[in-house]
Amino acid sequence: GVSGITNIVGVFFVKEYLDLSAVFLAGLGFWAGLPWVLKMPLGHLVDILWKFKSLLVLLGAIVMATSSVIMFGLIQYKVQMLTILNAETWFVISTLLAPIGFVLQDVVADAMTVEAVPKIDENGNEINFNELKSMNVSMQLLGRVSIIFGTLLVSILNLIVFADSSEMTELEKVKAYGDIYLYSLIVPIISISGIFL
């Protein structure tokens, strides 16, 4: 749910600062959606590389953070960023990196939900099917509740930041856009903290 924190800013950024056609953006949307299409085979890869799940979460967090830092830099330090690549190229790189990081973490999280439900009780007895099913349903419910909570949190944050956007100066808008990308770094931080907790 928290992953959508930059969606609104991304739309405004494209509209106000980039000269990209609708056809180009549709094509970019296809490529950005490709990691989600590949989620199933990536899930199988995670099963094969299970002992490295922490590294996969870390890699996903680094990729997500890189995407956010690129956009923050492009918004707040545009002149310096444009000496390396043009704005459209930076935007494309950032747009393609974000879903790769999210999918990497999502497939690990999916696999971990199965592992999180115990198969045996504290006495070493196998848990009966109905109780096991109930625990799995509870685990899925908690996951969905956290997604809803994250989405609401992000919506409220965007409402607060952009409440007076029509009255903002250009400099204030740029700062607000950049701040949202900085706030989005909380997502990989949450992921990395999960490795150590």
Give the label of every model feature segment.
Residues G1-V2, L34, L38, T66, ...:
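Hydrophobic/aromatic residues within the transmembrane alpha-helices of Major Facilitator Superfamily
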Residues K15, V46-W50, F162:
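Helix-capping/transition residues at the boundaries of transmembrane alpha-helices
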Residues T66, I75-V92, L96, L104-L197:
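Intracellular loop-helix junctions on the cytosolic face of multi-pass helical membrane proteins
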